[in-house]
C-alpha cells in the first residue's frame, strides 16, 4: 500500500523522523551566511552531503500512517503539500521540533526554527498517524531503529499551519527554499 499525501484527518498526530535543520545550517555556513566552528561543521556537514533516506521507516509506516512524504524543501513547505491534498490544517508546537544539540548551540531559537521549518535538504519523513495507531507506530519505528517525534496535530480547517510555543500562538515569517532563485 502506497503512502499518499491525501489521507490526513483531523485528530491525527503529526510526526517527523530524525532531526531537522542540520543540512540547512551546514549550507548556510558554506554560503558564508553563518560561521560554525570545526566541530559544529563536522557534525552537520554529513547531513547535507550524505543524507540517509528513511526507506525502512517509510515501509514500516504502510498501514499505519494516514499520509506521508519526505522533507526536501523544508517542513513547512512539504507539510503544506499534505495539508492541501488532505484539505486540513495543522498545529505545530515549536518546542517539540527535533533539533540537534549542534543546531541549538549554533543559533538563536528563532533562527533554529527557520532552519528546521524552511531550510530543506533534511530528507527525513513527515507523516500523520491516527490516534488508534500510535502504539503500533512506536513498535514499527523502534524495530527500524529510527528516532521520531510528534510535533503537532491535524485540525479541521483550511490548509495552513498554526505555530504555537506551548499553548501560545507564534507568528513566523518563513523564507522557504526557492528552486528558481
Identify the role of each PLM range.
Residues 63, 68-181:
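Glycine-/charge-enriched secondary-structure boundary and capping motifs
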Residues 39-81:
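Polyanion-binding loop/helix "lid" in catalytic or ligand-binding cores
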Residues 1-7, 37-38, 87-90:
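Phosphate-handling active-site elements
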Residues 1-7, 17, 49, 58, ...:
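A generic local secondary-structure boundary/capping motif
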Residues 19-20, 33-35, 130-132:
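Short loop segments at secondary-structure junctions
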Residues 25-42, 62:
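Short, compositionally biased
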Residues 1-29, 153:
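Glycine-rich anion-binding loops of enzyme active sites
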Amino acid at each position: 500500500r502506497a503512502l499518499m499525501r491525501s489521507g490526513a484527518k483531523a485528530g491525527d498526530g503529526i510526526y517527523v523522523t530524525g532531526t531537522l535543520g542540520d543540512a540547512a545550517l551546514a549550507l548556510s555556513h558554506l554560503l558564508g551566511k553563518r560561521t560554525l566552528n570545526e566541530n559544529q561543521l563536522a557534525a552537520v556537514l554529513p547531513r547535507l552531503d550524505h543524507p540517509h533516506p528513511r526507506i525502512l521507516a517509510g515501509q514500516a509506516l504502510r498501514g499505519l500512517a494516514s499520509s506521508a512524504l519526505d522533507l526536501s524543501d523544508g517542513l513547512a513547505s512539504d507539510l503544506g503539500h499534505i495539508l492541501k491534498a488532505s484539505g486540513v490544517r495543522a498545529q505545530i508546537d515549536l518546542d517539540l521540533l527535533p533539533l540537534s544539540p549542534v543546531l541549538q548551540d549554533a543559533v538563536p531559537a528563532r533562527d533554529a526554527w527557520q532552519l528546521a521549518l524552511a531550510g530543506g535538504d533534511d530528507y527525513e519523513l513527515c507523516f500523520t498517524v491516527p490516534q488508534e495507531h500510535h502504539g503500533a507506530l512506536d513498535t514499527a519505528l523502534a524495530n527500524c531503529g529510527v528516532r521520531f517525534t510528534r510535533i503537532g496535530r491535524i485540525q479541521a480547517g483550511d490548509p495552513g499551519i498554526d505555530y504555537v510555543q506551548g499553548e501560545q500562538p507564534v507568528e513566523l515569517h518563513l523564507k522557504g527554499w526557492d528552486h528558481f532563485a
